[in-house]
């Protein structure tokens, strides 16, 4: 199950002479599950971990998502996520940082391998804004799923993805990552062209449909690390009143 990828100023014969010792490795039978099963949830659970004296609350939330691919649902979900939490132009950042001033950053992403995948959103906010930040985050989820992406956001996303592609294969490390990705996932060498075609052809209606299916606030597991004595009561209020958010929040305290 091991592979070696080398990029640098070295030819094949010189490299082989340097790694000749690897021939002494003995192969073993290794069982690797093709997938991992996780319990499904139908409620939005907040796991609260106390950090005495903390001036901020660290918030991370997520749910299961698609396994890694280069031109399927996983890749298209990455495109969809960019206007929401892909960086400083994302809705989370503009709301929580630029508008509210509660945080230095707020991002979301899809992560995946050939075994599993996940969607995650994370930020650190002022302690007194913990519950309000949660409400704003879920408001952004709701808005993106119901109203969808704007044409301006769509064009900005396409330009960002296509623009950064030109700079992704310049260094030795970047080239190594590219080759390793091809080997790991048995990819066609022309997969980049396939991605470019998807980016050029994807529409607002495509993105809106993906957002409705791939973002699941109702299945979100939320972990908050902060000063529980200042935030627990406000978080408990979310169990009975969600400011119009139709999610079944449940608070569970983690002790250590």
Give the location of each predicted region.
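His/Glu-based metal-binding/catalytic segments typifying zinc-dependent metallopeptidases
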Residues: 30-89, 255-256
């Amino acid at each position: 199950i091991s592979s070696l990828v080398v990029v640098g100023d070295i030819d094949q014969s010189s490299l082989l002479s340097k790694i000749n010792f690897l021939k002494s490795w003995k192969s073993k039978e290794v069982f690797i599950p093709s997938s991992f099963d996780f319990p499904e949830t139908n409620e939005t659970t907040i796991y609260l971990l106390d950090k005495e004296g903390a001036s901020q609350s660290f918030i991370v939330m997520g749910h299961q998502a698609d396994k890694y691919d280069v031109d399927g649902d996983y890749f298209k979900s990455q495109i969809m996520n960019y206007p929401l939490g892909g960086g400083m132009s994302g809705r989370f950042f503009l709301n929580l940082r630029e508008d509210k001033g509660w945080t230095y950053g707020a991002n979301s992403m899809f992560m995946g391998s050939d075994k599993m995948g996940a969607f995650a959103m994370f930020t650190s906010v002022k302690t007194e804004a913990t519950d309000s930040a949660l409400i704003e985050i879920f408001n952004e989820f709701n808005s993106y799923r119901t109203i969808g992406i704007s044409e301006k956001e769509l064009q900005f996303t396409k330009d960002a993805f296509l623009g950064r592609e030109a700079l992704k294969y310049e260094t030795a490390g970047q080239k190594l990552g590219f080759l390793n990705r091809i080997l790991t996932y048995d990819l066609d060498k022309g997969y980049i062209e396939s991605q470019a075609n998807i980016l050029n052809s994807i529409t607002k209606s495509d993105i809106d449909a993906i957002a409705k299916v791939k973002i699941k606030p109702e299945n979100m597991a939320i972990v908050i690390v902060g000063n529980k004595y200042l935030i627990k009561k406000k978080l408990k209020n979310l169990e009975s009143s969600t400011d119009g958010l139709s999610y079944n929040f449940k608070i569970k305290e983690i002790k250590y």
